[in-house]
Amino acid sequence: MKRDLELIRKILLWAEQNCDGRHDIMAPFIHIAGATPIEIDFQLRLLRDEKLIVYEGRKLKPVTRWVHFTRLTSKGYDLLHALKNDSI
């Protein structure tokens, strides 16, 4: 699978509207037309690798299948702002 900046943009927009920093979010909860939960999860892994999303919930089991996150980081908001302004 490849990095998909358009899908990443849609995920960040979704997160901006739906994440409150308290609730656990995973790919199956994010509904984006034309994207499967597996495709969304892959992009979430990339966002997590770059510290653009963060998980601040309960401790997860090491074998957790999906990426969990609770909010965007400041870096995540910076990227979202840049993507909204087409400066990337």
Predicted regions and their residues:
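Short amphipathic alpha-helical interface segments
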Residues: 2-32
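Residue-level detector of well-ordered alpha-helical segments, enriched
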Residues: 3, 7, 39-43, 68, ...
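Generic structural signal for hydrophobic core residues of well-folded globular domains
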Residues: 15-18, 47, 80-83
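Short amphipathic alpha-helical interaction segments
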Residues: 33-54, 66-67
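Beta-hairpin "wing" of winged helix-turn-helix
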Residues: 56-58
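Short loop/turn motifs at secondary-structure junctions and domain boundaries
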Residues: 60-63
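Short, amphipathic alpha-helical interaction segments positioned at domain boundaries
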Residues: 65-88
